């Protein structure tokens, strides 16, 4: 049996395949090796397993984690091994999951547009080039957190239209000082800003919000995608909630910058199931 884990920034999704057929799917808590202990991860995986699922039947585990670097692969591998001792365990960053889900074993360009941003060139087996998105503070252009951060800055500085201000006031129960306190002193400021991606999406008919989303995608191209050599020769393939739900704004920007639209997926799991069925 194969077990695939797509561990995003908040909730990992697990899917078990037996002879290519989906046996079960379940969710667990988010895992950032920088902030959790080994015991916590082991206990949480065990707690998340369905009652009728026997971990001893798992032969291979493919764990793709957001923010998981090579330095942390051993930590994740050890945690999973304590729950599934007979399994061969593969650990990689979520960017490889996105490339495999979007492109399978074909070369091309792949991007993630969700709470954060990432992108790469992929040769059908491995990532060959990754222009660093630099994370929430320095970059992540085009992401939900980037849009939310810009909206909050404009709101606090009074640079939004009256119509947009009324919408924001109805959904953001904080003044400027409180927003600053949350961003600089509370955990996960990226998630705090990213939650307002839905507000922006739901109000795209208001020019301020549409222009904000459009410019965020333009900055994605200006600051990241245009740095890939000969980027216009690739199709734009993307996975993530922002890329999926903002398609009507994203597609014209992609075409304006000379790329053609390829595959757009809300989550990578469906593509990962396809990919690992061929193993």
What is each model feature region?
Residues 1-61, 79, 83, 99-109, ...:
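ATP-binding/phosphotransfer module of carbohydrate and carboxylate kinases, centering on a glycine-rich
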Residues 69-163:
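Phosphate-binding/catalytic loop of phosphoryl-transfer enzymes
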